[in-house]
């Protein structure tokens, strides 16, 4: 099968969030038995640079064309690409492919590719990755984009992938026909979790005792992640008879909120109990997951949490707010889901953190669910079967 993936950020720009990892994992799995190409841009916090100035490169076995943006600063400010020569190359090359898979539709490359795909009767699929509705940030710009391009891109798609039933309802609100919507979740690469690091490495590096409880957050340091709520809750937690026996580790790249986070930690005078590591990848991230007692995701909005799946792969229980669209199958099964307030979050954390039997049960259930459902081997088979319906 000849497949084209379109992603406005792509590996190695992991700081751009979970969409980069998802699009990479899907393309990587498909490349083993199919002819796969990815087109993306050179944007990241700092422009991506390539050997010998080539922008058509091999990324771990995946053929990728990175279009150079006229302005990286404009891309980061608006999330809109300004890709040099993209229309000319895409117009020429689009006929090579049997199907197109667009990751996030509010991007210039999606406009260009969807247009030429339609002109050449090539089916395309849209996977919004939690960005179906235009809200939270840059709402005015998103609404304008939708009026000019977005609605057309979604409605003309052969199929759209929803992460959850909640996202399915969002597609319906955007005018997508119900029979075009498929539920396709996110997953993890099981191979990356076959040989985990031994317990204690993260704790040793960051001075966390073996007798201390460790709560872990992994994600972008962004306002939407609910870190203000997490700090307020943790402040209450350690001053409720647990001072000195609990540590909180916050792992992830700054996405505009780090200075406010640091300020809030200082205001609460909990610097000795909170560890802010910055981004950790691969082995170092696995060390944090192995050493934690509980994974927490207090987001104000979250369609799916890949880092939560990673914690489940390490047999760790989850606590998340009901703002996360997966809360229905998490709650009482692999962790606890709570309301978006301090008292509810603290109660959920305490219930899981200090009940070892419950914590172990949640962890075992999570690991089983990863092996049975939420891994890229299974999900990729589902995606390929969907592709075949349109070729």
Segments from the language model and where they lie:
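Conserved acidic donor-binding segment of nucleotide-sugar-dependent glycosyltransferases
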Residues: 332, 336-343, 351-357
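Conserved donor-binding/catalytic core segment of Leloir-type glycosyltransferases
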Residues: 4, 209-225, 231-234, 249
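Aromatic "clamp/platform" in nucleotide-sugar-dependent glycosyltransferases that forms part
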Residues: 300
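Nucleotide-activated donor-binding/catalytic signature segment of Leloir-type glycosyltransferases, i.e.
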Residues: 260-280
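N-terminal subdomain of nucleotide-sugar transferases
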Residues: 1-52, 60
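Short hydrophobic beta-strand element within catalytic cores of glycosyltransferases
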Residues: 317-320
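Glycosyltransferase donor-sugar binding loop
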Residues: 188, 218, 246-260
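Nucleotide-sugar donor phosphate/pyrophosphate-binding loop at the beta->alpha transition
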Residues: 123-125, 133-156, 169
């Amino acid at each position: 099968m000849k497949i084209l993936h379109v992603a406005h950020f792509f590996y190695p720009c992991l700081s751009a969030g979970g969409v980069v990892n998802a699009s990479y994992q899907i393309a990587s799995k498909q490349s083993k038995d199919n002819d796969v190409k990815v087109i993306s841009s050179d944007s990241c916090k700092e422009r991506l640079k390539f050997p010998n100035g080539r922008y058509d490169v091999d990324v771990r076995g995946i053929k990728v064309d990175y279009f150079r943006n006229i302005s990286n600063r404009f891309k980061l400010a608006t999330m809109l690409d300004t890709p040099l020569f993209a229309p000319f190359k895409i117009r020429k090359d689009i006929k090579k492919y049997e199907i197109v898979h667009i990751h996030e539709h509010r991007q210039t490359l999606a406009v260009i590719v969807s247009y030429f795909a339609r002109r050449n009767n090539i089916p395309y699929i849209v996977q919004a990755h939690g960005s179906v509705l235009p809200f939270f940030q840059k709402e005015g710009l998103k609404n304008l984009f939708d009026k000019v391009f977005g609605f057309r891109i979604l409605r003309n798609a052969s199929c759209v992938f929803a992460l959850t039933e909640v996202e399915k309802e969002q597609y319906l609100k955007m005018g997508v026909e119900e029979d075009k919507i498929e539920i396709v979740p996110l997953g993890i690469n099981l191979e990356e979790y076959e040989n985990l690091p031994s317990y204690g490495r993260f704790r040793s590096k960051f001075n966390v005792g073996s007798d201390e409880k460790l709560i872990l957050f992994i994600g972008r340091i962004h306002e939407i992640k609910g870190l203000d709520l997490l700090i307020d809750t943790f402040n209450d937690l350690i001053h409720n008879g647990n001072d000195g026996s609990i540590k909180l580790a916050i792992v992830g790249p700054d996405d505009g909120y780090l200075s406010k986070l640091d300020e809030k930690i200082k205001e609460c005078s909990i610097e000795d109990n909170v560890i802010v590591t910055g981004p950790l990848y691969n082995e170092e991230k696995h060390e944090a997951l192995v050493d934690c007692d509980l994974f927490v995701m207090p987001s104000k909005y979250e369609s799916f949490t890949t880092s939560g799946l990673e914690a489940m792969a390490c047999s760790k229980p989850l606590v998340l707010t009901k703002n996360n669209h997966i809360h229905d199958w998490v709650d009482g099964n692999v962790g606890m889901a709570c309301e978006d307030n301090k008292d509810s979050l603290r109660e959920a954390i305490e219930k899981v953190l200090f009940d070892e039997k419950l914590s172990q049960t949640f962890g075992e259930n999570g690991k089983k669910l990863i092996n049975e459902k939420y891994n890229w081997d299974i999900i990729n088979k589902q995606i390929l079967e969907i592709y075949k319906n349109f070729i």
